[in-house]
Amino acid sequence: MNKKQKNKIAIKHQFPTGILVLDNKTVFKGVGLGYQGSATGEVCFNTSLTGYQEIISDPSYAGQIINFTFPHIGNVGTNNEDLESDKIWTRGAIFNSEITSPSNYRALKTLDEWLKKNKIVGLTGLDTRSLTNFIRDKGAPKGTISNNKNGIFNIKKLINNSIKWPGLN
């Protein structure tokens, strides 16, 4: 990791730049990170305290949007040794708090840079506990996660994407 990357600070946004829309029309707004675009999948949660890079690259999460419940994510950064596979299987990643700057000597990229490189849509600033409780009580919904720096979203289209997604087989 170079000096420029270490000195990056998070930018506070005045409006939502990321959104999660569930198939039951529930909408969660936050700040987008990672790849700008949209992805649809099954929304699940993970309660691990560590290992976010391994989780995102784990084939068992294929087709899923992972809601991370631990609030401090990103402090290890990303590297080439902490991958579960050569391919990224996850469709999206949701975090409660802003991504922490990496402070690990093995870090090659920030989590945000790594998500962008691997075309994974990310979202921060959500009440991940509320989403986790929803999933626990109602089951894993289909959802569409979207990241747009302009904060403009076609919610009707995102709901339809979520509803029409065939699900995991």
Functional labels for PLM-detected ranges:
Residues 2-169:
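RNA-binding accessory domains that recognize and position tRNA/RNA substrates
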